[in-house]
Amino acid sequence: TDQAATAFAAGKVDAVGAFPPFTGTAMKRPGARVIASSKEYPGAIPDLLAVSGDLISERPDDVQKIVKTWWDVREFMEKNPRKSEKIMAKRAGIPTREYKQYKGGTRFFSLEENLEAFSDGFGMKHMPYAAKQMADFMVKVGFIPEKPDMSKLFDSSFVKNIS
């Protein structure tokens, strides 16, 4: 994404799909403007933690520790927002003030929202539904030849163990 944003900023390509912090690079191009963002499509572009099925079957305790660590980090972020912003900005390689610009477009799910996201239902807030919609679209436009088996794609047990 960094190379694509840099190419766009240099005028080598006409459009780019980017996410923070690379949107900052893209927006340095004179006349650049955002034509669509994830703000207009809530729930359609989630960030998530994915691990292999092998890791789950071979080291489930370690996977559980990773998930617990995420919730420990979330608690730290809530209790230490300024320090968290500095840490995340440094990790992204951008000034804290620039990181703050992106913060409004970032939403972290609560534990309850995570559980709901794993559940069956209709609408993009339900990951099984969203995955089906995306797979159908990718088949329709020829990006993939057929819809993959998604029966074992989501495992809510690690999040449920936190609650």
Which functions belong to the PLM regions below?
Residues P21, E40, Y102, S151-K152:
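Residue-level "edge-of-site" marker
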Residues S38-I45, G104-R107, S156:
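A glycine-rich, aromatic-flanked flexible loop/lid motif
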Residues A131-S163:
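Conserved C-terminal helix/tail region of periplasmic/extracytoplasmic solute-binding proteins
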Residues S52, S110, D155:
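Residue-level signal for threonine
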Residues S37, E98-Y99, P148-D149:
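Residue-level detector of family-conserved "landmark" positions at structurally sensitive sites
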Residues D2-T96:
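Pocket-lining segment of extracytoplasmic ligand-binding domains
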